[in-house]
């Protein structure tokens, strides 16, 4: 890649480099919006080469995208003063009693603000300390290649020598350029002398000799230029190819070793890592190392070669002139440093607010149902907008500094032109130099200086690689305490399966101050089934982890058949154990492949495929999985999707059980294997577990005590010790014991009622309810007639209409509007900056016209060297120097307005787009969010990424594009004016010259993007394994994963090898051809000068205005990716903004209800429904439910029967395909949506709290503005929710920060705050969607009391898996396959002995 002395090349390169770096950050950070913010990428522009430019580099292009700071997430630290209490909450009553009421919640605002400020300072200091502690020193440059083979090292050294040779070509070219200039000047002098003295035979002979000499010199020098071009082509092709291939090989080895090292680490290693850190290392850091060890290393040496050769040549030719010209370097460095510091300051501050906005967006979009249920889209949208507005204000300030810094820096560059001609004129007039030497030295210094600037971004890539490698190598070199790669250890020939713990003490390495096991001693006899029960944190799962040897005890010993497990070979130990966890991880392969993973390390590992399949099939039959597997589209060869996402929870569990038992292990560990399942799925899975545990040592952990009643022995754990043990019946005999208390918390009454309810009529076939309303006799008749004619129900027809509309929407998304239409709309959207855009456009055009205009000045300056009188020569060049100085001042002014104007407008547009996109996103209905493309991750990623990409084009980049176009057009016009014929030749060569920029884009700029895409599949595989490291370790899949990963890396490597030969050849050809074209123009120009068609001044004017302007204009291709990304991003943003959801909470249409007159009578009539994303699944089928005002109704049934869908229908998250939902007899579709939802409150299974105070989160439920809610109303809601005493016991009371997603509170505390939020609006209807299912028994009891209190006097509809919480309901509806199978009171349904009765029996713990 060639260095260019031109600032236009420099600045354009800066834009593309900034874009590239922005994209790296956005790609690596956008699926995570809450990480520490790094320093903003800004500062001194680093010019990038596009072609060997030797003309006058005059036009600057504004700095790149400093203002377009990428999205990065800011992690939110916990508030120090309250975190201890929140994480380790003592008894709430004891806390409450310890705080006198007179002092509770009476803190002054001053004290609160003071304490908040102090906390923020402490938080900042802690973050700085953590950051310092986590920083590793970068590895040495040579360490980057420590895995390279000797032959590769030889090839790389040879490539570096070629890179240095390629870098030397441009300074050598200036030498040729200087010699040609001298020849032209000498010829012009002779012509002038002859013209002054008249034509005589002697002068005619002298003139002919001068012509012959010029023709000969021009021919020779043109050949030299072509030779340099050919040499540049060969050297560039070879070194780019060599370093590209060796970089890929080196990266492949590092990736393989890093993943191998990760998989061999003990589990404690992962406890200290962030959730996505391993994935980030694999996807991002390995890419950074590859980028910094491939051709960028060679480019560093090329630019260094250019710098050294240029300065050496300059000082050899004229030490005095060279010494004067190097004065520009410190000025450029100082100005760039100041600008970098200022931009980093403003950029980091802007990033802080953008990151906070991104974090808020993730929370809000991740809980969109809660947001819409409470109608708080506007409040949360305003909070988001506040952060964006603050970032915009800071970005505007930074824009001024950016423009000012660039204008000063480029003024210094242009002033150097004036110095060159002024001082050069003095030297020539004194006979110390000639025109060729002045041009040679000037261009050599300029090329050398810019090569140093261009070296910086490539050197930055190497520096980043060193930093990234430090993290990778730290893991690669780390020897874990528990090493799965260690082949040592005993492998006994036989195993009985007896496990014993002897005085085991343990704490997690990440929490050394929290003891988990305290002298734990017990024995699990071989072949028996044991159960561990107890409260959360009592040490149950830790026991399983110690048996798997995920951790080693701090003291004591764990033995297997009397041997310390630390003496056993680790892989052998884990291969004897089958583990099924609460959330089993399946890998992205087939059902068969997942089960076969359980055969690794067994005697069947290398069995034939047929034999393996028989084992897999048997294991699946034992696990009750064979039946559903055979119903899958491809049976055992069906892909299960990422993490088994295409299977239900129960299906995943059964496949995991089959995987655990397929190798017939002697030990089976079941860590809450059924707790996440509904009762029906739990029953099926529990049967599979009971069958699988026969003849094995089985240890089960369960919250649902019904699953372990048949265990041989049950251990009740508390505070890391066994506090009670025995069989189920033995433990129940101790009525006051801890186990009996746990049972009582889940106990159901067993008294049966005398009479049973009549079964509901089967209404399976009544699908013809008329769409959208109650069924009148005429409508029913019409519906039946329609079915008779078409054979299809109205619900089915409605679903077809929805599907057709979705297909139309998807087709429309593939159509991107014209660029003109998009850009016009974007400019209209940012119309507030209309004047700024106008001034910036004018400034960019003026900056673009500077280059061709000064081509005239350059040509005239060179013609001045023809003057023979020293004084006159010096005066003429001094005048040209003055004009250069004036040009420098003018250019500095237009550069300031261009850079500052476009940068500011870019920030403003970014802010407008973010706010409008976020507001439009929240306006969409739930159906929109259900689509995979609109998942929380995808939407938050788009919110972070898309406005950024539009800003990337409509900020400084837009100015650069306008400037480049102005340069090209202006150059052609001036060239045609000064020399039409030569201009036409130059214009004919424009496609070739401009293509250099395009080829550079394809080869260099897009190369990194292409390689990232090629590595996406292998990176996903590695991330999947790293994200399921416990599963990988328990299955001893480490070697298997390494093998698959290595195979996956071969594809990108082979493809890169094949494409590199062609692409690098094209790139090298574009560099070499430029020299050849310049040689052609020079030679033709010399011939026409000899023929008298052109003067020297005209020739150089045409040469600079067209040829070199075309080269620089080729830089516009650098921004093709920006334009493409901006177009697609803008189109996507406008689609989101323009989309009108069918259920629009912002709509002002519909009847308004008076809250005081709402009774709360809810009725669902003949509702049919299918989710649009799953049109083949009928969810609700003619569902009819009547809930009288003020009653408590419960919905129960197996998973997938339609209970939660019913709640969502009541919230009007969806509309039924047929039938209707009414409130007080009015179809809810006729009501104003926002007003309707204000009558309802929802408490879900996983309550969402937002970053902010407890007060803020409670007030989100209010129906009136927050400032109008009184403290008494807040207190009353909190007392009803059983959370008031806890809140006022906190140091900051209601002003305590809850952390992101309520992270500073326990599950029970979050749930009760959510209940208070639901109650503060005094709802007429309360919806409870499994509000206690995720809690342990103790928390469930407290929350259930709050719910019972909250339900009094309100229409309440509750869903619960734990039937103990709803047995006193006024009416219980038992769902089956989307319809009501039976309903009645608890006692009435028990008497029926139907589906509800079966559920009760499965959870009945007190039956003997």
From Swiss-Prot:
It catalyses: itraconazole(in) + ATP + H2O = itraconazole(out) + ADP + phosphate + H(+); voriconazole(in) + ATP + H2O = voriconazole(out) + ADP + phosphate + H(+); fluconazole(in) + ATP + H2O = fluconazole(out) + ADP + phosphate + H(+). SMART domains: AAA. It is found in: Cell membrane. Residues 17-38 have a biased composition (Basic and acidic residues). The keyword Membrane applies. Coiled coil: none annotated. Residues 1-103 are annotated as: Disordered. GO terms for biological process: oligopeptide export from mitochondrion. Residues 499-744, 1162-1402 form the ABC transporter domain. GO terms for cellular component: mitochondrial inner membrane; plasma membrane. It comes from the Eukaryota. It is a multi-pass membrane protein. Disruption phenotype: Caused higher susceptibility to nocodazole and rhodamine 6G (R-6G) but higher resistance to cycloheximid (CHX). Causes further increase in susceptibility toward fluconazole and itraconazole, when AFR1 and AFR2 are also deleted. Pleiotropic ABC efflux transporter that confers resistance to structurally and functionally unrelated compounds including azoles such as fluconazole (FLC), itraconazole (ITC), posaconazole (POS), nocodazole and voriconazole (VRC). Belongs to the ABC transporter superfamily. ABCB family. Multidrug resistance exporter (TC 3.A.1.201) subfamily. This is ABC multidrug transporter MDR1. It comes from Cryptococcus deuterogattii (strain R265) (Cryptococcus gattii VGII (strain R265)).
């Amino acid at each position: 890649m060639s260095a260019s002395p031109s600032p236009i090349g420099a600045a354009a390169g800066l834009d593309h480099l900034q874009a590239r770096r922005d994209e790296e950050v956005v790609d690596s950070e956008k699926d995570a919006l809450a990480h520490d913010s790094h320093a903003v990428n800004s500062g001194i522009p680093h010019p990038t080469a596009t072609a060997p430019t030797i003309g006058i580099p005059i036009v600057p292009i504004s700095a790149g995208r400093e203002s377009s700071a990428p999205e990065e997430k800011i992690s939110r630290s916990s508030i120090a003063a309250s975190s201890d209490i929140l994480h380790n909450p003592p008894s709430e009553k004891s806390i409450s009693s310890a705080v006198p009421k007179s002092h509770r919640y009476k803190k002054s605002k001053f004290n609160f603000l003071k304490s908040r400020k102090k906390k923020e300072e402490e938080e900042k200091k802690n973050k700085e300390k953590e950051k310092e502690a986590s920083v590793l020193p970068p590895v040495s440059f040579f360490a980057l290649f420590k895995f390279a083979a000797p032959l590769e090292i030889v090839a790389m050294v040879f490539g570096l020598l070629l890179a240095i040779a390629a870098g030397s070509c441009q300074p050598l070219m200036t030498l040729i350029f200087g010699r040609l200039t001298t020849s032209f000047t000498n010829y012009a002098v002779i012509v002038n002398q002859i013209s002054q003295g008249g034509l005589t035979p002697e002068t005619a002979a002298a003139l002919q000799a001068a012509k012959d000499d010029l023709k000969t010199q021009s021919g020779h020098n043109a050949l030299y230029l072509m030779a340099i071009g050919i040499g540049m082509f060969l050297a560039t092709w070879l070194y780019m190819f060599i370093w590209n291939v060796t970089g890929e090989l080196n990266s492949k080895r590092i990736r393989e070793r890093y993943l191998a090292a990760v998989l061999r680490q003990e589990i404690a290693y992962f406890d200290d890592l962030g959730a996505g850190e391993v994935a980030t290392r694999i996807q991002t850091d390995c890419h950074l190392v590859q980028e910094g060890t491939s051709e960028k290393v060679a480019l560093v040496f090329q630019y260094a070669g250019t710098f050294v050769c240029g300065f050496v040549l300059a000082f050899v030719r004229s030490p005095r002139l060279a010494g004067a010209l190097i004065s520009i370097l410190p000025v450029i460095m100082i100005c760039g440093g100041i600008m970098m510091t200022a931009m980093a300051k403003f950029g980091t501050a802007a990033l802080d607010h953008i990151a906070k906005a991104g974090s808020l967006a993730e929370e809000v979009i991740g809980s969109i149902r809660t947001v819409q249920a409470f109608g708080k889209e506007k409040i949360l949208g305003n909070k988001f907008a506040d952060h964006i507005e603050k970032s915009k204000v800071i970005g505007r300030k930074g824009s001024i500094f950016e423009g000012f810094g660039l204008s000063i820096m480029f003024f210094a560059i242009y002033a150097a032109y004036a110095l060159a001609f002024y001082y050069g004129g003095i030297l020539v007039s004194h006979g110390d130099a000639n025109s060729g030497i002045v041009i040679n030295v000037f261009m050599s210094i300029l090329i050398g200086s810019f090569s140093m600037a261009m070296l910086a971004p490539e050197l930055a890539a190497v520096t980043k690689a060193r930093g990234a490698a430090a993290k990778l190598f730290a893991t690669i070199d780390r020897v874990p305490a528990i090493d799965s790669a260690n082949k040592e250890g005993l492998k006994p020939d036989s195993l009985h399966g007896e496990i014993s713990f002897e005085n085991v003490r343990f704490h997690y390495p990440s929490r050394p101050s929290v003891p988990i096991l305290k002298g734990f001693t017990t024995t699990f006899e071989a072949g028996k089934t044991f159960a561990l029960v107890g409260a959360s944190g009592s040490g149950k799962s830790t026991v399983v982890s110690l048996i798997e040897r995920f951790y080693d005890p701090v003291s004591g010993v764990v033995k297997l058949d009397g041997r310390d497990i630390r003496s056993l070979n680790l892989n052998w130990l884990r291969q004897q154990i089958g583990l099924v966890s609460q959330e089993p991880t399946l890998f992205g392969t087939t059902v068969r492949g997942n089960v076969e993973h359980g055969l690794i390390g067994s005697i069947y590992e290398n069995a034939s495929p047929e034999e393996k399949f028989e084992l897999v099939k048997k294991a699946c039959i034992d696990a009750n999985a064979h039946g559903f597997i055979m119903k899958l589209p491809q049976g055992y060869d069906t892909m299960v999707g990422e993490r088994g996402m295409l299977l239900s929870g129960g299906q995943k569990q059964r496949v995991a059980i089959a995987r655990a038992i397929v190798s017939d292990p002697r030990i089976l560990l079941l860590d809450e294997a059924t707790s996440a399942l509904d009762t029906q799925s739990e029953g099926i899975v529990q049967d599979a577990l009971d069958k699988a545990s026969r003849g094995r040592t089985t240890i089960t952990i369960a919250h649902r005590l019904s699953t372990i009643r048949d265990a041989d022995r049950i251990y009740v754990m508390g505070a890391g010790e066994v506090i009670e043990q025995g069989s189920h019946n033995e433990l129940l005999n101790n009525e006051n014991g801890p186990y009996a208390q746990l049972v009582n918390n889940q106990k159901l009454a067993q008294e049966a009622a005398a009479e049973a309810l009549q079964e509901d009529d089967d209404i399976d076939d009544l699908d013809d309810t008329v769409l959208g309303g109650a069924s009148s006799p005429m409508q029913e008749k019409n519906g039946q007639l329609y079915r008779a004619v078409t054979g299809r129900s109205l619900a089915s027809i409605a679903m077809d209409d929805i599907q057709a509309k979705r297909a139309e929407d998807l087709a429309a998304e593939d159509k991107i509007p014209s660029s003109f239409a998009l850009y016009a709309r974007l400019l209209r959207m940012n119309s507030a900056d209309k004047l700024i855009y106008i001034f910036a456009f004018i400034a960019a055009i003026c900056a673009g016209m500077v280059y061709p205009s000064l081509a005239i000045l350059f040509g005239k300056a060179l013609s001045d060297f023809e003057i023979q009188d020293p004084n006159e020569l010096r005066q003429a060049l001094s005048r040209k120097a003055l004009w250069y100085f004036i040009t420098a001042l003018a250019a500095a002014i237009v550069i300031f307005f261009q850079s500052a104007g476009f940068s500011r407008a870019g920030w403003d547009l970014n802010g407008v787009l973010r706010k409008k996109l976020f507001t439009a996103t929240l306006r969409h209905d739930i159906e929109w969010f259900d689509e995979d493309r609109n998942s929380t991750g995808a939407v938050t990623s788009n919110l972070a990424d898309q406005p950024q990409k539009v800003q990337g084009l409509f900020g400084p980049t837009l100015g650069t594009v306008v400037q480049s176009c102005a340069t090209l057009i202006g150059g052609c016009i001036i060239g045609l004016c000064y020399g039409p014929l030569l201009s036409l030749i130059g214009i004919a060569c424009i496609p070739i010259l401009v293509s250099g920029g395009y080829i550079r884009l394809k080869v260099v700029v897009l190369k990194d993007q292409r390689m990232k895409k090629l590595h996406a599949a292998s990176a996903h595989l590695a991330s999947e394994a790293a994200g399921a490291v416990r599963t990988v370790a328990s299955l001893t899949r480490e070697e298997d994963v390494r093998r698959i990963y290595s195979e996956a890396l071969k594809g990108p490597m082979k493809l890169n090898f094949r494409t590199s030969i062609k692409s690098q050849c094209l790139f090298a050809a574009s560099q070499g051809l430029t020299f050849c074209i310049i040689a052609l123009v020079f030679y033709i120009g010399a011939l026409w000068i000899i023929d008298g068609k052109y003067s020297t001044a005209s020739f150089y004017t045409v040469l600079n205005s067209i040829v070199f302007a075309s080269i620089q204009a080729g830089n516009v291709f650098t921004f093709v990716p920006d334009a493409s990304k901006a177009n697609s991003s803008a189109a996507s943003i406008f689609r989101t903004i323009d989309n009108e959801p069918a259920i629009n909470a912002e709509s002002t249409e519909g009847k308004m209800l008076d809250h005081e007159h709402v009774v709360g009578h809810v009725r669902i009539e003949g509702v049919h429904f299918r989710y649009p994303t799953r049109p083949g699944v009928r969810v609700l089928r003619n569902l009819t439910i009547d809930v009288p005002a003020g009653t408590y109704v419960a919905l129960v049934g197996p998973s997938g029967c339609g209970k939660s869908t019913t709640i969502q229908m009541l919230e009007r998250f969806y509309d039924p395909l047929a039938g209707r939902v009414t409130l007080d007899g009015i179809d809810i579709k006729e009501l104003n949506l926002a007003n309707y939802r204000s009558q309802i409150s929802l408490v879900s299974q996983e309550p969402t709290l937002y970053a902010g105070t407890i007060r803020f989160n409670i007030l989100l439920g209010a129906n009136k503005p927050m400032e109008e809610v009184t403290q008494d109303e807040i207190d009353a809601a909190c007392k009803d929710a059983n959370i008031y005493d806890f809140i006022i016991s906190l140091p900051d009371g209601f002003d305590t920060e809850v952390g992101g997603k309520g992270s500073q509170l326990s599950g029970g505390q979050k749930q009760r705050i959510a209940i208070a939020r639901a109650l503060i609006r005094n709802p007429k209807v309360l919806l409870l969607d499994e509000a206690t299912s995720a809690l342990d028994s103790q928390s469930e009891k407290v929350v259930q009391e709050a719910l019972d209190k909250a339900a009094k006097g309100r229409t309440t509809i509750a869903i619960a898996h734990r039937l103990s919480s709803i047995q006193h309901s006024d009416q219980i509806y038992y769902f089956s396959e989307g319809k009501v199978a039976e309903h009645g009171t608890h006692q009435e349904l028990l008497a029926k002995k139907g589906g509800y009765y079966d559920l009760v029996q499965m959870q009945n713990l007190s039956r003997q």
